[in-house]
From Swiss-Prot:
InterPro entries: Prot_inh_pot1, Prot_inh_pot1_sf
Function comment: Inhibits both chymotrypsin and trypsin.
Gene3D superfamilies, per database record: Trypsin Inhibitor V, subunit A
Effect of D6K: In components B and C
This protein's name: Chymotrypsin inhibitor I, A, B and C subunits
Effect of D59N: In components B and C
Family as reported in the entry's similarity comment: Belongs to the protease inhibitor I13 (potato type I serine protease inhibitor) family.
Subunit structure: Heterogeneous tetramers of similar chains.
Amino acid sequence: KEFECDGKLQWPELIGVPTKLAKEIIEKQNSLISNVHILLNGSPVTMDFRCNRVRLFDDILGSVVQIPRVA
């Protein structure tokens, strides 16, 4: 495995959840996450990997549409 990160690393149960609530849940469940970015689905992102970052991709209604994961 190329990257080793501690704590919970993905949240499939947050699909369909409002992104602001999902952000709070992620930060509560993994205190090592200090960067939660909310992005419209399809937005371009950098390819660098960080153990402290999760990207939340949402739709125009503000609900999570992709599994949030450390990236």
